[in-house]
Every structure is written in structure tokens, then in C-alpha cells.
């Protein structure tokens, strides 16, 4: 059977493709390339967030100017273009959970939730309703045939690798999605945009968190979850109170800058005691993490979870989008996924994504991933952290009893 460039049967003109057009250079080039090849292309733009400063901020995603840019590109290419209002859905599925997670002391990655619940769920369903044979996006990731299905692989341009944000893509979605930019470097994509005369050829790349004006995520969270801005104490890992803070929302595990205390010692956020509004700080070595436990894992590997090797399997993992994958061992037992890191990571926070690969090479296959529930550090560090928390609880209890007696 003849397959076209998207691995679909027949000639390009036999296939209808929906392109998710964000108004940026990448998705615009995808639409242009597919149109040039002869595919029946339909552009769809999701209006996700269009309020206040985010609307006109350079690098905002799916806001007013982006929608206009997508419309202009579609008009130039001669393809139909539709705008779907997904603001309410985006608020419920992405923004609210993001604020809730941060208020609980986690470090969430909203782009993953957006791909998982909006772009690759709702938009994909719309593409099917339009009779499309595939949904194409401008993400930098590769999709190839793998047995009876398709699989995801790291892209040619590792500097633009977006696999970290796509690990939650289900097998059904992977089979339907196409990523034409996976084999192109970003520089070439911009060249193609210029050759096509696209108005977005020199447009800035979008930022990761599109709904946070000027990067002040704390303002968004404090507005939605005021309790996250409750004041509390900054406490050294040795138990000494160093000062006060204006809300857990301003901190994340691993943070060094902007802690708000000066001791002459390089201090990092080691732990967030959300219940008592305490920020625990300490030296960098207190952040060394050796083991991770994951929740909400999307497993795309070939091994059956029913017969998962008792010794685990060798994988590579990413706990940050900008870091290359590092070797580790993945275990699965009684419904629990855990990862033994062969190289320790610093400052891994609950809520972060841990993405799994079949190796640390440039063309590694994505095996899925999950979100960190908690981590384990060296035994002596764990003991020290538990001791300081226990001592603080004891002090609180004594203080409370004294106040009760005095009254």
C-alpha cells in the first residue's frame, strides 16, 4: 500500500489534515508544508487565554495577536481557518489545577496538562468530527511506526526537544497525531517560513506558561488561592528561624534566588511545609535526590505491567525539560512506579514531571512518564529533615498549650 509523507494511505490530496495553528512560526510552517504537498488542510486555533497583560505580551500563546497571526497565515495559504473558544475549558483543566498544585507546595507543569486535556483531547475530537485523517502540530518530536502502532521519539533538534511536555499522550492519540517538524532543526523552520513569505517568520517563540503575565505566576496563584499567600517562617534545616516570608506561593523546592534571608551561606529551598506555612532552607547538598515515586503514570513501553521484571528495567529519565535524559532504573510493583536515579538530581519537587525514555541517545523513544509524588534523599538528610519538622511541631504544640493556659 502506498503511504504518503504522513504515513497515511493514498496520495496527499486524498487526506484531510487538521493543523493546530497557535499563530507561531512552527505551526504556520506545518500548515504551509502540508498545503504545498497537496494535503487538504484545515487550520484550527484555540483561544485559550486572552485577558489583561497576557494578551499583548511578547511570547504569549493563543492570545489575541496570535489568533490574528494564525488567521493571516491561513488566508495567505488559502486554507480554511476556525477559532474555537476554549477559555472556560482551559481555566478549568489547566489554570485552576495549576494554582491548586502550587498552593500545595508542588511545582506543576501546566503545558503538560494543556496538551493532555485540551490540545490532544478536545482538539483531537474536533478533528475527528471534521473527518480529518490526522491532527498535525508544530511540536518538535518524532512519530514513527512501531509494530501495529506508532511511537514517539526525540527530535532531530535536541535543543528544541518537546518530548518532556508530551509524555502523557495516549497510544490512541499518538496513532492519530503527526509531527512534521521532528526531522527539522529550528533554524531551517525559520528559513522555510521566510521562503514562504509567512508574516510570522521572525516572530518570537511562545513562553512555557502562557497565562502568566510577565512571568509573575505568584500573582495568578494568590488571586485564585489566597491561602497560598499566607505569611510564615523561613527555617534553617538546623532548626533556627531565619526570618518571615509572604507566602508559600513565592517558593519552590530547589530555589536559591529571592529566598528573602541573608546569612552569608548559600541557601536553597529544601522543603515546603505547606500545612504550617514554613519554608525550610539549607545548603545545596540537602537537595540531592536518589529515588523518585510517581503517580498518574502513562506507560507506553513494550513491557506488560502484569509481568514487569522484578529487577526493574533500565531507562533514562528527564525531570526538567532543559536537561538531557540520565540513566536510571524503573520499578513497578503493586501499582507503584519508582525510579532509582543512577546520577542524583538536585531539587526535585512534588508535581514535577518525570519522563521516561528507552535510552539517553539523540533518537531515544519516549516510554511515557508520570508526576513526582515524593522523593528520597540520602538517609542522613532524610533524618535531619524529619528531626527539624518534628522539633518545630513540638514547639508549636508547647506554644499553643502556653497560650491556652494563659487565657
Curated annotation (Swiss-Prot):
One of its GO terms (molecular function) is tRNA binding. ATP binds at residues 20-27, 46, 138. It is found in: Cytoplasm. The active site is at residues 114, 210. One of its GO terms (cellular component) is cytoplasm. The keyword Transmembrane helix does not apply. Its EC number is 2.8.1.13. Residues 160-162 are annotated as: Interaction with tRNA. The keyword Glycoprotein does not apply. It catalyses: S-sulfanyl-L-cysteinyl-[protein] + uridine(34) in tRNA + AH2 + ATP = 2-thiouridine(34) in tRNA + L-cysteinyl-[protein] + A + AMP + diphosphate + H(+). GO terms for biological process: tRNA wobble position uridine thiolation. Keywords: ATP-binding, Cytoplasm, Disulfide bond, Nucleotide-binding, RNA-binding, Transferase, tRNA processing, tRNA-binding. The record marks 139, 352 as: Interaction with tRNA. Disulfide bonds join 114-210. Belongs to the MnmA/TRMU family. Catalyzes the 2-thiolation of uridine at the wobble position (U34) of tRNA, leading to the formation of s(2)U34. PANTHER family: MITOCHONDRIAL TRNA-SPECIFIC 2-THIOURIDYLASE 1, TRNA 5-METHYLAMINOMETHYL-2-THIOURIDYLATE -METHYLTRANSFERASE. This is tRNA-specific 2-thiouridylase MnmA. It comes from Bartonella tribocorum (strain CIP 105476 / IBS 506). The lineage of its organism: Bacteria, Pseudomonadati, Pseudomonadota, Alphaproteobacteria, Hyphomicrobiales.
Amino acid at each position: 500500500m502506498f503511504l504518503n509523507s504522513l504515513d497515511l494511505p493514498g496520495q496527499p490530496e486524498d487526506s484531510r489534515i487538521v493543523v493546530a495553528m497557535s499563530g507561531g512560526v512552527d505551526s504556520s510552517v506545518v500548515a504551509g508544508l502540508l498545503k504545498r504537498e497537496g494535503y487538504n488542510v484545515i487550520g484550527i486555533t484555540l483561544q485559550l487565554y486572552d485577558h489583561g497583560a497576557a494578551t499583548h505580551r511578547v511570547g504569549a500563546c493563543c492570545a489575541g495577536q496570535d489568533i490574528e497571526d494564525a488567521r493571516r497565515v491561513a488566508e495567505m495559504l488559502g486554507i480554511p481557518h476556525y477559532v474555537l473558544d476554549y477559555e472556560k475549558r482551559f481555566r478549568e483543566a489547566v489554570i485552576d489545577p495549576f494554582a491548586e498544585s502550587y498552593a500545595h507546595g508542588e511545582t506543576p507543569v501546566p503545558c503538560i496538562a494543556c496538551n493532555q486535556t485540551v490540545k490532544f483531547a478536545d482538539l483531537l475530537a474536533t478533528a475527528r468530527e471534521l473527518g480529518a485523517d490526522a491532527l498535525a502540530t508544530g511540536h518538535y518530536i518524532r512519530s514513527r511506526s512501531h509494530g501495529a502502532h506508532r511511537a514517539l521519539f526525540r527530535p532531530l533538534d535536541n535543543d528544541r526537544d518537546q518530548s518532556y511536555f508530551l509524555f502523557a499522550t495516549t497510544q490512541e492519540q499518538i496513532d492519530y497525531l503527526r509531527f512534521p517538524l521532528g526531522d527539522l532543526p529550528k533554524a531551517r523552520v525559520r528559513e522555510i517560513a521566510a521562503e514562504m513569505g509567512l508574516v510570522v517568520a521572525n516572530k518570537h517563540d511562545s513562553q512555557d506558561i502562557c497565562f502568566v503575565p510577565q512571568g509573575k505566576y505568584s500573582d495568578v496563584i494568590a488571586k485564585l488561592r489566597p491561602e497560598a499567600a499566607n505569611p510564615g517562617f523561613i527555617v534553617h534545616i538546623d532548626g533556627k528561624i531565619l526570618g518571615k516570608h509572604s507566602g508559600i506561593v513565592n517558593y519552590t523546592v530547589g530555589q536559591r534566588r529571592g529566598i528573602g534571608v541573608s546569612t552569608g551561606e548559600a541557601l536553597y529551598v529544601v522543603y515546603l511545609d505547606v500545612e504550617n506555612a514554613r519554608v525550610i532552607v539549607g545548603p545545596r547538598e540537602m537537595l540531592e535526590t536518589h529515588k523518585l515515586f510517581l503517580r498518574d503514570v502513562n506507560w507506553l513501553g513494550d513491557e506488560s505491567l502484569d509481568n514487569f521484571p522484578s529487577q526493574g528495567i533500565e531507562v533514562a529519565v528527564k525531570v526538567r525539560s532543559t536537561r538531557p535524559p540520565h540513566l536510571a532504573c524503573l520499578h513497578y510493583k503493586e501499582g507503584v512506579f519508582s525510579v532509582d536515579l543512577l546520577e542524583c538530581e538536585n531539587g526535585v519537587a512534588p508535581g514535577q514531571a518525570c519522563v521516561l525514555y528507552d535510552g539517553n541517545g539523540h533518537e531515544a523513544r519516549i516510554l511515557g512518564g508520570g508526576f513526582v509524588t515524593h522523593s528520597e534523599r540520602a538517609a542522613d538528610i532524610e533524618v535531619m529533615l524529619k528531626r527539624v519538622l518534628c522539633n518545630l511541631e513540638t514547639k508549636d504544640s508547647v506554644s499553643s498549650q502556653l497560650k491556652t493556659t494563659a487565657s
